């Protein structure tokens, strides 16, 4: 694992996983390895809760004779704003922040980041710094800057706490750095015909 180094597991602790269901459908463990191989995936980047499955996935690669395994990176979990444990969908309702990218109609219809006025690049910027340090004091990044600055060496092994207020600050900062015309266009798309009651300079 690129982040955690060599991971050793006692083979006696490994159980026999089901690779095919009774209806003939492959399980995740089998399908994801086969798909990643044929898609020529170079890096598998996922949460640390999947680390215990790595030995099994590695053995599936070996059983097929596929020596060109992807590099694995198991990222630290995002933790609750308050209390112990990883962030869950229920925490959004509990602490008053959106969970989904856009509105979601489940048992209860909930608004997403888009409906709350969050810019996509602001949310990506905020999330990128949870568990990763660019090595500088710089916090506000454009997408292209993030691509240039990112490296696995900046990743942390410990979980990062989700801070809704910090998320709002990132969004505020990105809005301030966005041209007025682009902000106006975003408002028009978000509110549809509702924006027509306002003058362009008011937007």
Report each predicted region and the residues it spans:
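Active-site cores that bind ATP or allylic diphosphates and position pyrophosphate for catalysis
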Residues: 1-94, 98, 109, 134
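Catalytic adenosine-cofactor/nucleotide-binding cores of aminoacyl-tRNA synthetases and other
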Residues: 64-203
């Amino acid at each position: 694992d690129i982040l955690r180094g060599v991971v050793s597991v006692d083979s006696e602790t490994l159980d026999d996983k089901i690779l095919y269901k009774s209806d003939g459908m492959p399980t995740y463990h089998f399908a994801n390895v086969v798909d990643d191989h044929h898609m020529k995936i170079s890096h598998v980047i996922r949460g640390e809760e999947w680390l215990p499955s790595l030995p099994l996935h590695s053995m599936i690669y070996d059983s097929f004779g596929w020596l060109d395994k992807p590099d694995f990176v198991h990222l630290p979990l995002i933790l609750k704003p308050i209390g112990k444990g990883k962030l869950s969908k229920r925490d959004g309702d509990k602490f008053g922040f959106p969970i989904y990218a856009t509105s979601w109609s489940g048992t209860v219809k909930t608004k997403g980041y888009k409906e709350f006025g969050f810019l996509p690049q602001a949310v990506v910027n905020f999330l990128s710094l949870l568990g990763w340090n660019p090595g500088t004091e710089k916090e506000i990044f454009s997408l292209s800057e993030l691509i240039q600055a990112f490296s696995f060496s900046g990743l942390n092994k410990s979980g990062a706490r989700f801070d809704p207020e910090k998320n709002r600050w990132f969004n505020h900062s990105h809005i301030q750095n966005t041209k007025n015309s682009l902000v106006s266009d975003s408002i028009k798309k978000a509110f549809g015909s509702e924006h027509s009651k306002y003058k362009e300079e008011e937007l």
